[in-house]
């Protein structure tokens, strides 16, 4: 997995982008035309980053987590202060490189790929070094032109 680091935006500074959050939920469509006002505002930095000093971004590479909603090229929001729990998607260090996998603590510690490809196998390293917990996955639905 190749890694690209991105500087986290400071939610309290000029990097903060507040956008309208509509109260209506949409069923695979747009907000109702009758909803002409936003009930509140949403700052994506505040929503995605609860601990700025412990949060960083990585770009996912590969297909080993495609059935867990992590696609090749997705932006991962990672919190180093979050305590890893069984079933969390984590960034772990294996042989000096980062990998994104599901953490299994039972019956024995393991890093599990969640893929539709049988080529990826569950890893059972002697020592698992967890670098952080993936708290959000940002996925583009349209290619940049």
From Swiss-Prot:
The keyword Cytoplasm does not apply. GO terms for molecular function: DNA binding; serine-type peptidase activity. The active site is at residues 64, 101. It is an enzyme of class 3 (hydrolase). Its EC number is 3.4.21.-. The record marks 28-29 as: Cleavage. Keywords: Autocatalytic cleavage, DNA damage, DNA repair, Hydrolase, Plasmid, Protease, Serine protease, SOS mutagenesis, SOS response. GO terms for biological process: DNA repair; proteolysis; regulation of DNA-templated transcription; SOS response. Involved in UV protection and mutation. PANTHER family: LEXA REPRESSOR, LEXA REPRESSOR-RELATED. Belongs to the peptidase S24 family. This is Protein ImpA. It comes from Salmonella typhimurium. The gene is impA.
